[in-house]
């Protein structure tokens, strides 16, 4: 696919997320609170809280903020009670989109998500309409130039499912969600730092968009990610390198 660079797409998305750091902190605090409420305040016995804690650390969130969010969740303090809800839909050219939310008002959230899809050339689908196009897994992406041998050794010893290197030298490691923390710790012990990592919905097949379609799709994704209740947006779209 001419102009399609996986590394450029990763860098582009990471740059957009970094630019929204204030909103990112809000999302992570919500994630920490929900994780602590569901599984307790000890990250060593609460894998979901451990992942949220690591995400907060990577985002340079002060430890005091993290601890307050844990205490608020584990203490069962009165206030908002969030539920997790997933929406599925289609973007430009039938591209698949998954929107994961945490909300205290499902009616408000679905209205906002539906409006975003409709206004920007997409449409909200039924439950299950696109989820089959994605795999729920742990994912680590390493920059070109990273030692493939070192990554491979650490990954497989920690129980990763797959290690793949593309023509640009980008190394991708996939593992079961339950093994994510163990694999991450194995990489840290080996002195490796992934450019991007997380438990994600990984697209099984990609749809490339270029030109005006790419611009419109990027706008839809930006609007969805800007909604207060939205935690994560996944898509099977890759953009032309020039976008």
Swiss-Prot record:
Localization of this protein: Cytoplasm
GO molecular function, one term: DNA binding
One GO cellular component, as annotated: cytosol
UniProt-listed Pfam families: TACO1_YebC_N (PF20772), Transcrip_reg (PF01709)
A biological-process GO annotation: regulation of DNA-templated transcription
Keywords: Cytoplasm, DNA-binding, Transcription, Transcription regulation
Primary location class: cytoplasm
Start and end residues of each stretch annotated as Disordered: 1-21
SUPFAM superfamilies: YebC-like
Recorded family membership: Belongs to the TACO1 family.
HAMAP family referenced in this protein's UniProt entry, alphabetically: Transcrip_reg_TACO1
The name this protein goes by in its record: Probable transcriptional regulatory protein BP2308
Organism (species): Bordetella pertussis (strain Tohama I / ATCC BAA-589 / NCTC 13251)
């Amino acid at each position: 696919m001419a102009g399609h660079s996986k590394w450029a797409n990763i860098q582009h998305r990471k740059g957009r997320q970094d630019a929204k750091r204030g909103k990112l902190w809000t999302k992570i605090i919500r994630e920490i609170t929900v994780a602590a409420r569901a599984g307790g305040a000890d990250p060593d016995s609460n894998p979901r809280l451990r992942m949220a804690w690591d995400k907060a650390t990577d985002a340079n969130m002060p430890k005091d903020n993290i601890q307050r969010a844990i205490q608020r969740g584990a203490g069962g303090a009165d206030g908002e009670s969030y539920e997790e809800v997933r929406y599925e839909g289609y973007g430009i050219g039938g591209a698949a989109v998954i929107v994961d939310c945490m909300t205290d008002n499902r009616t408000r959230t679905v209205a906002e998500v539906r409006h975003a899809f409709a206004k920007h050339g997409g449409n909200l689908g039924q439950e299950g309409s696109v989820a089959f196009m994605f795999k729920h897994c742990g994912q680590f992406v390493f920059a070109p130039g990273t030692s493939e041998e070192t990554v491979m050794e650490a990954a497989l010893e920690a129980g990763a499912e797959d290690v793949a290197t593309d023509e640009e030298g980008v190394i991708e490691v996939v593992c079961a969600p339950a093994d994510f923390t163990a694999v991450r710790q194995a990489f840290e012990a080996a002195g490796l730092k992934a450019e991007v990592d997380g438990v994600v919905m990984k697209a099984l097949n990609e749809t490339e968009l270029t030109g005006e379609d790419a611009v419109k799709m990027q706008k839809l994704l930006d609007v969805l990610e800007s909604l207060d209740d939205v935690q994560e947006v996944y898509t099977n779209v890759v953009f032309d390198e020039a976008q």
